[in-house]
């Protein structure tokens, strides 16, 4: 609908009253607008300072030709003073903003912006975009933070704006849904839609100038707008932290509720329940919801509200008299919240609440489209109308006779006689299982009642295998016997159709980027990886039926002779409690691995035959023809070898064996393993995890030599000094020396900042170099013998992530930092021999082009690989990719490629690159050319690993963030083998050639050993 002239006059008249208007902001004067909290200090921006900076940014936008009513996309790393002020400058420039995913590839970002009709983009810090799709217009420093402005290049015919109508007047922002209520949609939000929400919440929660609101919701999740605008509406203060809940809940807790009484804590906190739980019940009760905490309002939304049983573990009933604990509900389609309930009792069920604004209308529709007291909830409003092209441009858009526009929530609710609304479940959580319709939400609630208050459960449906999986989050690890007792108790309290096929125990549930329970990731963690058919049956028998494996075969034989009644694997499947329903489930899963359909049918018949013991079934599975890893692979092209002999030319066709990796063992580290894996002389494997656990393992069996529990998480690669001494950096800012065989701590040295960079032992074995995130000195040199500090210095203005590169011949180091600085430093005394600077940060560890070379390679995060001279650091050649580079580079100089070296690295543009590097005479020049690149289907953060496997030759191991792992031919980039781990992979692998095994950490909490 095109607004009339009167509407335009009214909207212009209302402009000064908008909560983000610069004059309104300036009126709050010296009131703090934003506090940026770090461990060392608070950076405070007042409303007056904010107004001045907004004016500067508005001039910057106008100078670069940004017109009124333009859409400006935001590609920002996190909430910072600069990003907040840029949003306000965009709005005051009569434009609207469009938050985007910072991890999105440039091509996808270009496509999304084109669909949204957005022509401009602002990126901050190290984030960049490909020049193929975007034109750089200019940059500006905002509180020492670089902000760059781009414009999309001319759109192709394939990229069309989605909306068929003009955008609403007074546009405020455009945002994409997460897909919770269906596939992701673009939502265009005018000011008139969000403003009443902010005014209503301000009144109901009594928000005032005295409040401090945590700005912690990601910019791509629309509740962040509520946090942001609540402060502007009331002159309250926003608080941001350098840490996130995904990074370190404990550090976020310390930032929000500091121990120092002189430092103010927050008063308003908005989170999803899943994210809030990550604080831990004890911290929630003692610090967040204690009577003495600064918190005044807690808003939990985006997911089902916690149960009364869980609430009791979080707070004393008296807290409800002091604080507003709120269930807040809404959908992005009516931005942002619609219903609010302030909890009055810890014993009563918590409803969805009542409308925040008076004009919000509720409607419940059942399956037959009749208005009912049970069914799907629809939210409607006369005033609060977002424009959703995908929906509103359809002829049958949902609107009743009164002009109210209704939006589906995708949630099933129940309305009681007094009008109170209660959440039931998601509408797509009802699935069909063996002819029965089952409700995942109902089953979850039934199982939750069987669990202690400290445990949490959710049920998942694996469509491909038609399997019901019950995930149980337990903070304390359980023995198999304890798990078995609990699962049988659960099975006795649900119907056969509701009984889970598998129970999975985890110590934490993963969250997506918006803080909601990530069910897709949870499913990946639960699906067994390449599990042998026998093990599938054994696991099912153990988890679901009354049959356990006999540990002592001789004892079982004696028992069978002494006792006529069969037991254990002498039982038939039916005697063990199996039904045809169970048999179908097992055959469906095992059948995916069977090559012959008749064998799958025969397995089903054996399971239902009461005269066939399980022992016989297991023997049959041992002989059945199975497809390894359930992946069909292309045949590897055969190599042709030509040779000569006395009788003439003979051509032999030699077929290289098809590569196949299988899992030999895996070890649970309880939390993510992002650290690179280290091996020592083929005898030890060592790695640390987010769980603070550091393990040294036997590479052949996975058995544990030692375990060390450090105070904080570990993302640093272990360095071995000897077989009895290794060292590792920790998030607590200390370097630890430990005995890998016993686990005893040998030394502990405080460095002053978290350590992600691998500590380096110099070639002469006399010094240890440690690079860190410390604020004062980010490079330390210690004596290897006594760990005394020999020298320390600071390079650049930012921390150091990359490991240093040693130049043994020059007795120097190359050190790269996160502000782009890179320096050559003398090992003997720490003197800086030269310093240069790239435009962007460096996460990638530099590497020499050859073992003895005048050239080293280094990669900027912005996607540029540079060849630099060792003598002065000057750039000799550059190769550019279209994505960020976090992977380190691996260099190889094969004897068959005379005069060439090859550099291999991963990129978040989903490609693995191999560059051909040719040096000129005297090593004074170099050429970098693309040798090959491979699309692996997902971003790559982990450093690739080179493997020599005979007779296949040199291979490249590559792991992507979605769990894909693959082996690639070094010569031509052809994929020789691929599979997928259950979780994301950020860990760099190691390879022991004699054992032909690869060791890699995964975000499903396991360290995997895969054998070739």
UniProtKB/Swiss-Prot annotation:
Family: Belongs to the ATP-dependent AMP-binding enzyme family.
Gene symbol of the encoding locus: Aasdh
Top EC class of this enzyme: ligase
EC number(s) given by UniProt: 6.2.1.-
Pfam families: AMP-binding, Beta-prop_ACSF4
Organism, as annotated: Drosophila melanogaster (Fruit fly)
Keyword Lipid metabolism on entry: yes
Key words, A-Z: ATP-binding, Fatty acid metabolism, Ligase, Lipid metabolism, Nucleotide-binding
CDD domains hit by this protein: A_NRPS_acs4
InterPro entries per the UniProt record, alphabetical: AASDH_AMP, AMP-bd_C_sf, AMP-dep_synth/lig_dom, ANL_N_sf, Beta-ala_Activ/Resist, PQQ_b-propeller_rpt, PQQ_rpt_dom, Quinoprotein_ADH-like_sf
Main function: Covalently binds beta-alanine in an ATP-dependent manner to form a thioester bond with its phosphopantetheine group and transfers it to an, as yet, unknown acceptor. May be required for a post-translational protein modification or for post-transcriptional modification of an RNA.
Keyword Oxidoreductase belongs to the record: no
Protein name: Beta-alanine-activating enzyme
GO biological process, one term: amino acid activation for nonribosomal peptide biosynthetic process
Molecular-function GO terms, alphabetical: ATP binding; beta-alanyl amine synthase activity
Domain of life: Eukaryota
Residues involved in ATP binding: 177-185, 411, 426, 516
